[in-house]
Regions:
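Alpha-helical transmembrane segments and their immediate juxtamembrane cytosolic regions
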Residues: 1-395, 401-406, 410-417
Length: 417
């Protein structure tokens, strides 16, 4: 089976950065428990939330980035993927250590022992060596530190998946669906320590990641008719309204009465661990509507108001890690200084401002680093430097995979996380 990959004129899809930044902000706000900030996150208005969007976009962008690297051979592409896996893993371990240090220091310093148990940091006190070892193995995870281990696993398994997807995309997508169904049916999951299993079941959540990759490489072009269908539009909007009402019903008994106990219990509690089908469908509906009403060349994407979100999306690994720490610090400050509405809003605004500042700093730092690789004679970049990878459209004919090397000098290279 021969396939060819054709690229449109070079253009960075700012929608990916925008929504990835939005997912980061939403996850930060949703991780400050017991505050009005959680009502600014997605999870209270539908079945899916920022984590679903984050994993989907990560799969989409990973396919775009590493398809080009696979052009130079499977071994080279795999080595680049594993290098990125190592970067994500080390970021998680650094976050893991700093997070535990913050929790235990503030707990001791301000005589707040409940912090240790609330954020699942207590086991480190009783068995530090064992828990640190299990942390390195990604089996022990304090509260809110579940996303990056999931991403390490998904990226670590991506080389053979991408290689196969470039040749048999539909077969890989079908295999992903079958694995998802089997994991839910037979309760397959990875073990956690000291007990239980992973909060984000990789065997189920891989479906979102693979769906993103499949759409990036072939599915988006073939399913474009969904964006033009008025019937799909009506059904999508109806499902979003249903999802919002059903989710709000978990907090409002008056709404719960509209659905009845049997229907309500089908959707509550929301099965996030095993990626309930209604969560997956909810995100797909959001993606269809987003692609329909926000085209890739929408002029509004260049507006100044969206630049902080886009910048946070472009530097999402660093922003995500900082956001997790800020969520804990924000919660602690509110417990210490008062949990009034104004204080909560100030904590949320300060957290987003710091995350945005980190994103701009990292973007500036990367530009400085890249400029150091410029040739001192003619100002050209070193040969190993790569440009951006834009949206791919799968077509018949040709060989696997020849990807154009066009770049847009106005935008930074597309990154996978």
């Amino acid at each position: 089976m021969k396939l060819g990959l054709a690229l449109p004129p070079p253009q960075r899809d700012l929608r990916l950065d925008l929504f990835r930044g939005l997912a980061n902000w939403a996850m930060f706000l949703g991780h400050v428990p017991g505050t009005v900030l959680v009502w600014c996150s997605f999870r209270n208005y539908g079945f899916s939330d920022g984590a679903d969007l984050f994993v989907f976009i990560s799969g989409y962008t990973s396919a775009l980035v590493y398809t080009r690297k696979m052009e130079r051979g499977f071994v080279f592409g795999t080595s680049r993927l594993f290098r990125r896996v190592w970067q994500i893993y080390t970021a998680h371990i650094l976050l893991f250590l700093i997070y535990l240090a913050f929790v235990h220091f503030l707990s001791e310093r301000f005589n707040a022992p409940d912090l240790v148990n609330l954020f699942n940091a207590g086991p480190v006190t009783s068995a530090p060596v064992e828990m640190m070892t299990q942390g390195l193995l990604l089996r022990y995870k304090p509260l809110n530190l579940d996303v990056l281990p999931l991403y390490v696993v998904l990226m670590g398994l991506f080389p053979p998946i991408l290689w196969l997807m470039l040749r048999f995309p539909d077969a890989v997508m079908i295999g992903s669906v079958l694995l998802y169904l089997a994991a839910r049916q037979f309760h397959w999951n990875l073990p956690s320590y000291p007990s239980g299993s992973w909060y984000f079941n990789p065997l189920a959540w891989q479906l979102l990641f693979v769906t993103g990759a499949w759409l990036a490489l072939t599915g988006a072009g073939r399913l474009h008719f969904l964006l033009r269908s008025r019937f799909v539009l009506v059904v999508a909007i109806a499902y979003l309204i249903f999802g919002a009402l059903m989710t709000l019903a978990a907090h409002q008994p008056q709404l719960r009465a509209l659905f009845g106990p049997a229907l309500f219990e089908l959707f509550n509690p929301n099965d996030k661990t095993n990626l309930a089908p209604y969560r997956y469908l909810h995100l797909m509906v959001l993606i269809i509507l987003g692609a329909r009403f926000i085209p890739i060349d929408a002029r509004g994407l260049q507006a100044t108001i969206w630049r902080p979100l886009i910048k946070c999306g472009q530097q999402s690994l660093e922003v995500f890690c900082v956001g997790i720490l800020l969520a804990f610090i924000g919660y602690f400050i509110l417990q210490l200084a008062g949990n009034g509405i104004l204080a909560q809003l100030l904590v949320g605004a300060a957290g987003i401002a710091i995350m945005t500042a980190v994103a701009y700093y990292r973007a500036w730092s990367k530009r400085v680093e890249k400029s150091s690789h410029e040739s001192p004679v003619d100002g050209k970049r070193a040969p190993e430097s790569t440009g951006s990878v834009e949206h791919l459209v799968l077509r018949g004919g040709g060989r696997v995979p020849q990807v154009a090397r066009g770049t847009d000098s106005r935008q930074p290279p597309l990154t996978e996380v």
